[in-house]
């Protein structure tokens, strides 16, 4: 059977279902695929097809995630759903499943629960830009006032974590009834997807962002100059562009790209995803090192102090067997290099056990090009013991 051509005319958006255990995330995922399939937007997936998510390994961490896809009139969606709470935590911190926006599922019969709060906090810390709320199981609640109360609670909770709680869409429905084909509830699923279409912004694709390339290797070509190689992480670079060399030093230095090579061929420009060699004007072999980045001037700056959301690998995942405390000094692996850093745990937290997730403050011994949302691994003697994402820059 010939493979279908991927339709690029629609914008592509990554979403996921979040929320407390048993509030109906997987049922909703099944309902969305089923209802949209009736309207020609992909194929229906049954609950048990989604629930038996295969285990994946991302940065040495075991995560179960189900991936489904579906389409609306205007967009193509890739949707992730995780079976267990721990899978969400790991997924969001490692960035295994990128989310451009999330559908927060809250059972109208129970209201917001501890994991509802935790998923919202995590989303803020890892930079999920937008939420649409689905109040599920409304068929089990007869009292209209109670529904309004739950909606207010959810809105307040989102506001507490700096999301626009008063303005974001809240759709009421029943995923199970929609799955069973009850027309009134199928309508609510279409209403939900219309809200997702409208409210979750189309992400700026990597190609459109300011240029950045982590330096993997450096060598000099006699008579031509110094070449930095690496994979372009975002944006594009053209011959003649001015770039900054950032990280591992207090100040960034500027240079001009005088040549771009890929697979031994000369190019006029390179874009996100390309593995290239960039020839740099007036830069000596000693001026640039692995672990630095080439970037569009002014687009990213070097920092040493930041707050981060971190998942600590369990013993079974090959992590530490013992807890760690404040002043723990592991290596932080950013893009292509390790830098030593000191950890400070939040007030009232004495230690962190393997398998926990925690917000911590880090101070690196040398500055690295970082920004909110930059991901890293924590390593000890070459093995990964944690995975994290920068939630805010301190200095």
Swiss-Prot record:
Residues 19-26 are annotated as: G1. Its EC number is 3.6.5.3. It catalyses: GTP + H2O = GDP + phosphate + H(+). This is Elongation factor Tu. Residues 60-64 are annotated as: G2. Residues 174-176 are annotated as: G5. Residues 10-204 form the tr-type G domain. Keywords: Cytoplasm, Elongation factor, GTP-binding, Hydrolase, Magnesium, Metal-binding, Nucleotide-binding, Protein biosynthesis. Its main location: cytoplasm. Mg(2+) binds at residue 26. It comes from Oceanobacillus iheyensis (strain DSM 14371 / CIP 107618 / JCM 11309 / KCTC 3954 / HTE831). It is an enzyme of class 3 (hydrolase). GTP binds at residues 19-26, 81-85, 136-139. PANTHER family: ELONGATION FACTOR TU, MITOCHONDRIAL, ELONGATION FACTOR TU-RELATED. The gene is tuf. Residues 81-84 are annotated as: G3. Monomer.
